[in-house]
Amino acid sequence: MTGQGRLERRDGAGYEGDFLDGQMHGKGTYSWADRRVYQGAFRNDKRHGSGTLRWPNGNQYVGDFLDNRRTGTGRFVSAENDVYEGEFLNDQMHGNGAYVWSDGRRYEGLFRDGVKSGMGVLTWPTGNTYEGQFLEDQRHGLGVLYWRDGTTYQGLFALNQMNGYGVKTIPNEVPVFQQWRMGDLLEAWPIVESDRCRLNIDDAPWIFAGSSCINGQAHGSGIAVSVDGQAYIVNGRFVLGRLIQGDVKALPSPESQ
């Protein structure tokens, strides 16, 4: 069959539209027995090209299809009025996109296999914002958390919690280098330059919290954070104000909001 036609299947599904050599090919409408409906392009008996897929619960997708799957760019609106616009792969949100929840939350960034994974920005209706790494739908890795009042935390996260080391800055207060364990604050060190125990790395001043100082120089084992709050060292070894052993790790830089 070639041209316009109608097809009815034993399982209750049906198609009405263009055919080419007996296959759905061109523009048409396909309906399933469960009341899903697809309207759009077909190629070689498959949904392929631009189209609209509607579910009986009110969900709707408008965008690209490839070999029967949502692949390419598109817009998905849920029955709850959540909206996603961006890239899809094999029926999943995958790649760059933006998701807006009906409660006002918004995420813009990378998705993988249907969840937030990679770099992104999450904003709450309160005005608070997180910018950084995500893994399997959770804040995980390096990031910066911005509060509406101007407070920032730049550091490590795990499973949506502050976890590891970071710098918290409150307006009109001294920045504080902190250690967290799954949302619980373990220790904190104000970042204040002092002549009592000096430390310089790459000609920049650092704050040292360690075992001892000799002649005003950082000496022994301990942790250190740069005065600008952009880097830190854990389990370092220092001799008379110099780093002998330990890795310098960068912290994300907060930008003006």
Regions found by a protein language model. Give the residues of each.
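Glycine/tyrosine- and acidic-biased, solvent-exposed loop/turn segments at the edges of beta-strands
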Residues: 1-257
